[in-house]
């Protein structure tokens, strides 16, 4: 596996039509190897349909901890919550790491661009991350969710500006915003300014209102929006005591829907090309005419002819934000000699 950060394609897409597939499916909770095998089956199926781009939901690897307690409460600390976090941390993956190697292999073997939602562990801090892979079996890089939502902030760290890539590829300019990051106008604007054409939106939001957000972003950004959400039943989660839901979910029957999906593909002209699917696990596939990007931007280009930088201007800090910086003795000596 090799990595490539923001590698420019420096050209137009090799074809004006790109077939893209969204995978709407549930994580195999507390079992990352089984989740990877499930991902493999869906990737193979999508590739057999001629798809060049495959997008998975938020936190597909590692799992979205819907309904988890983690013992949280203001001023509350308990052993049950700590042990829940221990198990959740064990399901997360290192980036890079063996699971990333496996995903790169799957992308290369099936000749697809792959966008995978994963829970990344960096030491003992977790991040909600989107991973990008090329048909050549390369790990292109990652985007860490900038702002976890609500109680997600108690279990996930915040990404920084160093991981907001848009990759210039033969099938279009590819990037991602995760779940409610899509409600952050300034982050969307940063992606638009990087020329995003294939706007991937891995999410855990299966609400009807989410569809309105996706439609707006497609029109606002003049880009294709590919929103992937998990479809989960209560029986997809472990039973007590291995998985402890909040009371509302505890009342549900095994076949009751816990996450209803709603995955959808929308064109830059605001046309729903596939989905939304609120019924089951499965694939959602559409052919994307990249010429629609130019057609849409005739009338509206939010970071071009329809912008007013003399009045409104955005500055994006892409420097990594680390809590500790170590300066070696050699670097310190060189720094002292320059004073």
Swiss-Prot record:
Keywords: Acetylation, Cell membrane, Hydrolase, Membrane. It is found in: Cell membrane. Disulfide bonds: none annotated. CDD domains: nitrilases_CHs. It is a peripheral membrane protein. GO terms for cellular component: cytosol; plasma membrane. It holds the Pfam family CN_hydrolase. The active site is at residues 58, 145, 179. The modification N-acetylserine is found at residue 2. Induction: By indole-3-acetonitrile, abscisic acid (ABA), salicylic acid (SA), sodium nitroprusside (SNP), salt stress and dehydration stress. It catalyses: a nitrile + 2 H2O = a carboxylate + NH4(+). GO terms for molecular function: indole-3-acetonitrile nitrilase activity; indole-3-acetonitrile nitrile hydratase activity; mRNA binding; nitrilase activity. It comes from the Eukaryota. Residues 18-290 form the CN hydrolase domain. Its EC number is 3.5.5.1. One of its GO terms (biological process) is indoleacetic acid biosynthetic process. Can convert indole-3-acetonitrile to the plant hormone indole-3-acetic acid. Belongs to the carbon-nitrogen hydrolase superfamily. Nitrilase family. This is Nitrilase 2. It comes from Arabidopsis thaliana. The gene is NIT2.
